[in-house]
């Protein structure tokens, strides 16, 4: 599903991520989610649904194109703040405390 929903009938990443995470549980395989991650809330949702990490590209390209290294730092600070706020509102004090029952798909 990289680059958008190319096929109309393809499910969104968030719809299939919990199933993938369950199928890979205990295998040692890390789940990296790419595509559509723009905010700290998006990062939180992906982690809650079973991702081990997220990959973000386009927003960083936009940030560096618009304001160089300073733009990237502003974007990183924004992501970190949004993630921290979302975690706090959901009662998660660490990344390890983010759980599936904190989000709805």
Task: Please annotate each region the language model reported.
Residues 1-11, 61-64:
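Glycine-rich, proline-tolerant flexible connector loops at the mouths of alpha/beta enzymes
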Residues 15-33, 38-105:
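Alpha/beta catalytic cores of nucleotide-metabolism and tRNA/nucleoside-modifying enzymes
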């Amino acid at each position: 599903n990289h680059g958008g929903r190319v096929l109309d009938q393809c499910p969104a990443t968030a719809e299939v991520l919990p199933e993938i995470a369950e199928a890979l549980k205990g295998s040692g395989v890390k789940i990296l989610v790419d595509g559509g991650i723009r905010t700290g809330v998006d990062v939180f949702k992906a982690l809650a649904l079973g991702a081990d990490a997220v990959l973000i590209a386009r927003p960083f390209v936009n940030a560096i194109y618009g304001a160089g290294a300073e733009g990237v730092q502003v974007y990183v600070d924004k992501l970190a703040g949004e993630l921290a706020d979302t975690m706090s509102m959901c009662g998660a004090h660490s990344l390890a405390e983010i759980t599936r029952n904190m989000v709805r798909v």
